[in-house]
Amino acid sequence: MGLPALEFSDCCLDSPHFRETLKSHEAELDKTNKFIKELIKDGKSLISALKNLSSAKRKFADSLNEFKFQCIGDAETDDEMCIARSLQEFATVLRNLEDERIRMIENASEVLITPLEKFRKEQIGAAKEAKKKYDKETEKYCGILEKHLNLSSKKKESQLQEADSQVDLVRQHFYEVSLEYVFKVQEVQERKMFEFVEPLLAFLQGLFTFYHHGYELAKDFGDFKTQLTISIQNTRNRFEGTRSEVESLMKKMKENPLEHKTISPYTMEGYLYVQEKRHFGTSWVKHYCTYQRDSKQITMVPFDQKSGGKGGEDESVILKSCTRRKTDSIEKRFCFDVEAVDRPGVITMQALSEEDRRLWMEAMDGREPVYNSNKDSQSEGTAQLDSIGFSIIRKCIHAVETRGINEQGLYRIVGVNSRVQKLLSVLMDPKTASETETDICAEWEIKTITSALKTYLRMLPGPLMMYQFQRSFIKAAKLENQESRVSEIHSLVHRLPEKNRQMLQLLMNHLANVANNHKQNLMTVANLGVVFGPTLLRPQEETVAAIMDIKFQNIVIEILIENHEKIFNTVPDMPLTNAQLHLSRKKSSDSKPPSCSERPLTLFHTVQSTEKQEQRNSIINSSLESVSSNPNSILNSSSSLQPNMNSSDPDLAVVKPTRPNSLPPNPSPTSPLSPSWPMFSAPSSPMPTSSTSSDSSPVRSVAGFVWFSVAAVVLSLARSSLHAVFSLLVNFVPCHPNLHLLFDRPEEAVHEDSSTPFRKAKALYACKAEHDSELSFTAGTVFDNVHPSQEPGWLEGTLNGKTGLIPENYVEFL
């Protein structure tokens, strides 16, 4: 029920009904007044709360903006960069939103609080004042009326008329006040319908504007939100794979820590307790010590994990001798004494165990070492990049593209291991290797075929993209600019050997076809990168850092798939020069110890001095020009070459011969001299000039001189007979009775001085085995039972009871 209307005619009657109606209107005004007061109070509390909320959100945004993600590794993937940038994006959105909130709060006081206060004070307050006046006039009118009615009729007529006139005036004034009051009450009741509600509407409009601004921010944020969601999902997927790899490595380290020890530049390193003499007795201080065998340098860093840091300055000494302490000569166990060249007295050290002391002793006294004899963690098989290998890959690709290109989870779902091995044994059987490429029967499941393809690539002696280029590929993936990544990877691919590049092109063309059907098989470019990254760029050693680089391996594969036509069908824009190739090899050799397979297949390779390498290149180039113009000019060029060979050059590194099974099956007829020729080291001392000493010089020294001096002749006359080259050498090379054996029977010439079976030999250089049939060793290792092998350029010897192959030019006979 609404309020009854106040009629002006009722003011004259001033009936009880009028009074009741007026009271109901007055009660409504009181109710409205109280409500507005409470509303203003709540509105102020709301504004204060909004200010506190805005302040808290700004502080939250500032915290987000200040935090910086630190990822493992020296670079971040695109996904990691997107995630790392997300906190700053969140902070920006929140700040923008709070700026709009502050504007809304400032307007709220003007559009809500002030109008309500004004309405309550001016309108309702005026009605209250009118009521007071009305009540006062009512009381006055009623009093005068009662007094007037009590006048006696015996009064004079003039007095009665005057009293009547006075009552009429008071009544008239009362009626006017009553009419004005009724008018004001009705006015306030009508005004509150808009003057009270309108500020609330304006406040809500400001609130809606704030929310709409948030909606617009959300729309603008949508693209980044989608990108971030994808990056988070990709990172989560990589985390699952990385976690399993790290957990597997952790279990291997638990089972055998020494076998999976990382390659270190130090011969030996670890914690030792060093005895320090004090004024009153001695104390044992914990040090982290490193030892380099080549320089005989021992570095001692005082460090205790319990105290949380270093306890002094580092100290380095040069080792003179190392002696084990007798058990009865000292109370401590596992002790040994070290004498230094540049420090007087004896340094007594305590190892952590008997085995630890044995390793330190063997490292320092030149005994046969057992450190760093890590087995290659990669599974090596009989797979090769030969005609059979290409046939196997083509068969698998043909079967996949004809029968299973749309199968979901292609290459991600693995086949049964026994079936995979059986299929590989069938494909690798030489009896069936020459069959057509479509002879994989339909009985083999697609997942078995795809697993066989991946397994064969993992069985190769080295990854398809080669160990020595792995760091370069990873660095290319870490470049910020996408074009730079593609360009660098393009250049690196064209530095791969021809067979590797052909196989990689074959594989990438196939993976591009798979990715083109990703709507059916669900294998996007990113998914294929996850599958093939660790296979094509598998690390040389299992470490946490290598596992963390898997994400960049995946990026490399993604780039190869997406840009396979450009990378494999076009030449790089800026091909690398020889000097750049040399620098890249030098950086690679500086960053980690090279394995045997990583040494380049050249006669000599400079690993320290770029200037000396360029000098030798200029000498060889001049010899090439002389040979091309006149073969007899070799006599002139030899005089300029001989002084360089007579000088002892420590920068000349011996190159390990290439195993025959790792060579291409059909070398090009136009290629340089076959690398299956034995290679020789440069002489370590100047060659004698007298005929007597020349006759007695080792064949190996003469061979080294011959190879270096006439490299140009050999390259220029590759198609001519070897005896023609030999006839040119006779004119300027000191006569040696076995020189012709270098060309007729190279193995016999090399082994003439070592024809006696079961001799001992000493390693001149360190080498890490790349095959199970090879031996790993360091410089100074002594081999037993050394004798010629069936493979050119290799010897067989025994080390620690194991017999295997040794690069011939890595050792000298004792």
UniProtKB/Swiss-Prot annotation:
Residues 756-814 form the SH3 domain. Residues 7-262 form the BAR domain. PROSITE patterns: PH_DOMAIN, RHOGAP, SH3. The modification Phosphoserine is found at residues 668, 671. The record marks 412 as: Arginine finger. GO terms for molecular function: GTPase activator activity; phospholipid binding; protein-macromolecule adaptor activity. Residues 383-568 form the Rho-GAP domain. GO terms for cellular component: cytoskeleton; cytosol; endosome membrane; focal adhesion; mitochondrion. Changing residue 671 to A: Significantly reduced PINK1-mediated phosphorylation. Residues 624-648, 673-696 have a biased composition (Low complexity). It comes from the Eukaryota. CDD domains: BAR-PH_GRAF_family, BAR_GRAF, RhoGAP_Graf, SH3_GRAF. Residues 662-672 have a biased composition (Pro residues). Residues 265-369 form the PH domain. The modification Phosphothreonine is found at residue 670. Phosphorylated in a PINK1-dependent fashion promoting retrograde mitochondrial trafficking and clustering. (Microbial infection) Interacts with human parainfluenza virus type 2 proteins P and V. It is linked to Leukemia, juvenile myelomonocytic: An aggressive pediatric myelodysplastic syndrome/myeloproliferative disorder characterized by malignant transformation in the hematopoietic stem cell compartment with proliferation of differentiated progeny. Patients have splenomegaly, enlarged lymph nodes, rashes, and hemorrhages. GTPase-activating protein for RHOA and CDC42. Facilitates mitochondrial quality control by promoting Parkin-mediated recruitment of autophagosomes to damaged mitochondria. Negatively regulates the growth of human parainfluenza virus type 2 by inhibiting hPIV-2-mediated RHOA activation via interaction with two of its viral proteins P and V. This is Rho GTPase-activating protein 26. The gene is ARHGAP26.
